[in-house]
Each structure stands twice: as structure tokens, then as C-alpha cells.
Amino acid sequence: MPARRLEKICLICCRGGSKTIKNKNIKNFLGKPLIQRSLENILKSKIFDRVILSTDSKKIANNAKKFKIEIPGLRPKNLSTSTSHQFDTHKFIFKKLNINDKNSIVCVYNNNPFIKSNLIKKSYKLFKKNKFKGLVVDASKVDGDYIASKQYKLEKKIFYLHRNKFLKLSLNRQT
């Protein structure tokens, strides 16, 4: 039996219940819903074998369906609060879809419309070159208590998580 090819997987966690801007992930930003901008750039990068959206919102899921990505049902409410940790959502999705850590897994924050496909490509190349176990891509400058401020910054605008630090550093609010 031939060895199974490892997959390149992109996971986007997209919560419906934003405390600051109601329905922010489906609000228009420069003419397009926020989630659409992220999905277009992820797909334009042509890196991933699978793009998976984890959400608790029917509206977000319906908005994303036209992109023919995987939406494995709505995630449980306990993984969708403002204090839920993304790492718990990742574990839930990986278990549900039988994804193991031998695959290349990249998490892209959906609520930043400035993540362009070239940044995703550049990030992925560095990710593979350095043999990191996980990657989080975000295009914002990090100051203060922003979600990505708990990740290591190795290069401007590109954030990596080492496997031995992932649990500790991934304890942040859902986006």
C-alpha cells in the first residue's frame, strides 16, 4: 500500500458573536464581506489541498459556501465564546476531520483583510524551510493585547508557533 501523501491544510476560525462589531466577519469592507477577502487570498495563493472554515454562524457558513471550501458543520457554542481558546477549536476540528499533526497545518486569521496571497505564500515557504510545526499568518503590527501578541514574531508580519509552545501561546480569544 503506497504511503498517504501529507496534506497542506489551512484552517480559519470565524466566530459569529463579535463583542465589538456585530457580524463583523460578514460586514462589507471596501465592497466585500471581511471573510470573503480572506478566503479569496487564501485560495489565490494556491498552496493548500484543503481549506477548512470553523464557525458557529449559519450566516458566515452560507457566505463562505460559494468558495467550495470545507465547512464541517457548525462548531459547538462552548468553543465559540469570547473567552474560548483557538487551540481547543483546532483540536475539535482536527479530531472531527481525522487530521493528524503530520500534515502541514496553517491557521490564517480571518478578520484581517490585509493578508494578501503573496504574504501567505512567503509565510508558507518559510514555514516549510524552517520545519515549523505550526504557522499563524497575520498582517497587523502587534502591540498590546492583540490576539497575535502572544505568538513569537520571527519576521515582520509573519508569526510562527513552535509545537512545544503551541498550547501555551494559543490561549487567545476566538476571531
Model-derived regions: residue spans:
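N-terminal nucleotide-binding beta1-loop-alpha1 segment
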Residues: 2-22
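Conserved acidic residues
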Residues: 8-9, 49, 70, 103, ...
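Structural beta-sheet core signal
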Residues: 10-12, 53, 107, 134-137
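A short, N-terminal amphipathic alpha-helix
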Residues: 34-50
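Short internal beta-strands
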Residues: 36, 51-55, 137-139
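Short phosphate-binding loop-to-helix
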Residues: 52, 58-106, 114-115, 122
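Conserved core of the sugar-phosphate nucleotidyltransferase
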Residues: 83, 88-89, 101-104, 110-175
